[in-house]
A protein has these predicted regions:
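A short, structured beta-strand-centered segment in the mid-to-C-terminal lobe
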Residues: 91-99
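N-terminal regulatory/effector-sensing and dimerization cores
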Residues: 2-92
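Short, surface-exposed, charged/polar-biased interaction segments
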Residues: 28, 51, 72, 97, ...
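An amphipathic alpha-helical interaction segment
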Residues: 76, 81, 100-146
């Protein structure tokens, strides 16, 4: 089962934007960065490029901020017991996204589906998330050597 807590796309924040949740959330947070960003990973501040993503796992520290310019992202806070989420190959570490526009469109669809609930919404949300996670895995696989 999957439950979307909050979801949004095309979020825009000023160049001094900071988001800090020291103890994380009880669910997952998936971010798709549309601008360069700075993240705190294992106690180190690191810069990530636009067209990157990160999947924060439940209870993980969440800290990200603008990197000196306007900050833009798509995001979803959710709970899921599906294996495509629980077994995602890279968590709490940024990774490149090979088709950010495609993923952006999926965030739009997830937002619309969660906002206009119908009898098919739960199944539709699961299918959309499955496709999104499949596309995100492509970026990880393309980055891996060999």
């Amino acid at each position: 089962m999957t439950e979307i807590e909050f979801v949004g796309y095309s979020a825009v924040h000023p160049s001094d934007f900071i988001y800090d949740v020291p103890n994380g959330f009880t669910g997952y947070l998936l971010l798709l960065f549309d601008s360069p960003s700075e993240l705190l990973i294992d106690g180190r501040l690191m810069r990530t490029a636009a067209n990157s993503a990160i999947l924060y796992t439940p209870g993980s520290r969440i800290y990200y901020r603008a990197a000196g310019e306007e900050y833009r992202n798509d995001w979803i806070r959710f709970r899921s017991d599906h294996s495509f989420v629980k077994l995602f190959p890279l968590t709490n570490t940024p990774f490149p996204v090979t088709d950010p526009e495609y993923c952006h469109q999926l965030f739009k669809l997830l937002t619309w589906e969660s906002a206009f609930f119908s009898s098919e919404s739960e199944a539709n949300i699961t299918h959309l998330l499955r496709v999104l996670f499949s596309k995100l895995r492509e970026g990880i696989q393309n980055e891996s050597p060999g």
